[in-house]
C-alpha cells in the first residue's frame, strides 16, 4: 500500500464490518498469518499487522498507537515528500511544526529548551523538541529521543504519547475531557 511493501491495509473494510455485524466491538486488531514484516494503523478504524514475524509484538503496539490514539510516526525519511509545513500545526498530539506548541507538550518543556534538542545520552529521558517525525527528517519535531512510535526497540511510549493515550481513554470512560 502507498508503494511500501511493509505498510498493510485492507481494501475490504466494508466486508469486514458486515462480517462483524451484531458483534459488539470497540477496536479491531487484524492479524495477517504471514512472517513478512509489516503493519498499519488507521485512526479510529483498525490495527493490522503480521502475526508470525519476530517483531510482531512491538509492531502491533506501534500500529495500535496510530489506530487508537492518532499518534504519528516519530521517524523520518530523507526522500519523503513533506506532508507537514511550518505554516500548519499537525493534529497528531506527538509531533509539532512549532506553529502552536502550547496545545501539545509545551507545558512539559524545560526552560530554555534548545531547538532542535540535541540527541545525547544526557537528554535520553528528557522531553524536548527533537527533529524528525511524521516521516520527515526536517521541520517536524517529536517530544522524546526514543518512543514506541519511533523504533521497535523502545520499551514504551514516551510521556507525551502516554498522556495522549490516557486522555483518550479518560474521554471515553468519563464522557468528557480528561483532567490533568
Where are these regions (language model features)?
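Active-site-proximal segment of zinc-dependent metalloprotease catalytic domains
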Residues: 1-79
